[in-house]
Design a protein with these regions (language model features):
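Cytochrome P450
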Residues: 1-277
Length: 277
């Protein structure tokens, strides 16, 4: 993991600038994930394309097509793992099949959750973190001067910058604090607001690497906890350690500005950075 992160940073460092989302944030999680599950690097454009379509393309037909293509792709991967299992997570899933713990349909669904959960959220988290640090030099220098803070910094960034909103469909008419909800209405539930609750956090909108606790539910909790959380955390920490060590001073390119969108997933889509090469 660390070697790949360093390689990617060293690739952009001499340039003195980059569009962080396209040049880094959308690439690093995919490359790391493909290595983690022992899939060929050549599949990156396919995987990235499906994720981009499902997460950001408003065309419902395009989303359905991307879901179908990714389902077919992963079904083939799992079929191959049944013939030639290894030590990767997909091989462990098909092993659980053989032990009667899950069925083949559940295997594909679980694999897709890992695939999409382990990539898009990291892309968005990287972009929110880097934008904040580009605009807040005191926090940036605090991390540079005290690398031991990196682990807590990841948790604080995850608390402050939520990524996912849960979509739900109302099963019946009801009144919610004066708002009329009708059966069939679609709603977005911003679960990240838990981390911004003033009754639980002092100055919740501020980023503070020295909080007593950084409790958040951006990865869910209990049996529905995100399967990719144990990969996302070290990815973000290693990125912070290596980026700050190599490019400690950076900022938003003058005359330019970040762009983003909200919806089921919060994301920055454009982040122009500069630094002294």
């Amino acid at each position: 993991m660390r070697a790949l992160v360093v390689e990617m940073i060293e690739r952009v460092k001499p340039l003195g600038r980059c569009e962080f989302v396209a040049d880094f944030a959308v690439q690093m999680p995919v490359d790391l994930f493909l290595r983690f599950v022992e899939l060929p690097a050549e599949d990156r454009p396919l995987v990235r394309g499906w994720i981009e379509t499902i997460a950001r393309n408003p065309d419902r037909e395009a989303q359905i097509a991307a879901h179908a293509a990714s389902y077919e792709y992963l079904s083939a991967v799992l079929a191959e793992r049944r013939k030639r299992p290894g030590e990767d997570i997909f091989s462990r899933i098909v092993k659980a099949e053989g032990e009667g713990k899950i069925c083949p349909v559940d295997s594909v669904s679980m694999g897709l959750n890992i695939l999409f959960g382990g990539i898009e959220t990291v892309t968005s988290a990287l972009s929110f973190i880097v934008r904040f640090l580009a605009e807040n030099p005191a926090h940036r220098r605090e991390l540079a001067q005290n690398p031991a803070l990196m682990r807590d910094a990841v948790e604080e960034f995850m608390r402050r910058f939520g990524i996912l909103n849960l979509g739900r469909t109302a099963a019946a008419d009801f009144d919610f604090h004066g708002v009329q909800i009708r059966k069939g209405d679609r709603m977005l539930l911003p679960i990240h607001l838990y981390g911004l609750d003033e009754s639980k956090f002092d100055r919740p909108m501020d980023v503070d690497f020295h909080r007593e606790h950084f409790r958040h539910i951006n990865f869910g909790s209990g049996p529905h906890r995100c399967l990719g959380s144990n990969l996302a955390r070290p990815e973000l920490r290693v990125f912070l350690e290596e980026w700050i060590a190599r490019i400690p001073e950076f900022s938003i390119a003058p005359g330019d500005a970040p762009k983003g969108h909200s919806g089921a997933a919060m994301a920055i889509t454009y982040l122009p950075l500069i630094w002294a090469a």
